[in-house]
């Protein structure tokens, strides 16, 4: 059992207020959630790349839409960076994939190719956004370190 701490108590007290403030102050978010729930009454939603998403219940529609968009985006991102990495480097020699966890890809590489690999990883965000036809591009940047602990 987790012991009570001042931090835990404050998170419980103010966490819901932060969520309410975010919802209230993010223009269009409430409308998007309501429109998504309204569309969900038909039992399915259309996700990125026109994928059909099957719902268990209308109240979970927005979460399903977000989760599927994240998964589709990450798959496209991985395709983009893999194509570019393999144009310049040999998998298993200069670089290798270690893990792909939710919204992060872990790569190990030779020290002399860190910079060009970081450039490929950074450019991959725009390439994936373009490939998926997003109006607002996802942005990100790689973290470099000797371990998972150093990069997170």
Model-derived features: where do they sit?
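Conserved catalytic core of nucleotide polymerization and phosphodiester-bond processing enzymes
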Residues: 1-152
């Amino acid at each position: 059992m987790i012991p009570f701490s001042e931090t835990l108590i404050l998170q419980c007290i103010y966490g819901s207020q932060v969520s309410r403030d975010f919802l209230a102050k993010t223009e269009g978010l409430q409308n998007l959630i309501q429109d998504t729930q309204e569309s969900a009454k038909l039992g399915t939603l259309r996700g990125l790349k026109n994928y059909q998403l099957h719902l268990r219940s209308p109240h979970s529609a927005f979460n399903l839409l977000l989760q599927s968009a994240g998964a589709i985006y990450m798959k496209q991102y991985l395709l983009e960076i893999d194509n570019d990495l393999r144009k310049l480097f040999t998998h298993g020699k200069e670089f290798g994939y270690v893990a792909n966890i939710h919204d992060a890809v872990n790569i190990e590489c030779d020290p002399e190719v860190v910079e060009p690999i970081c450039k490929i990883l950074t450019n991959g965000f725009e390439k994936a956004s373009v490939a998926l036809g997003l109006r607002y591009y996802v942005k990100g940047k790689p973290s470099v370190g000797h371990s998972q602990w150093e990069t997170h």
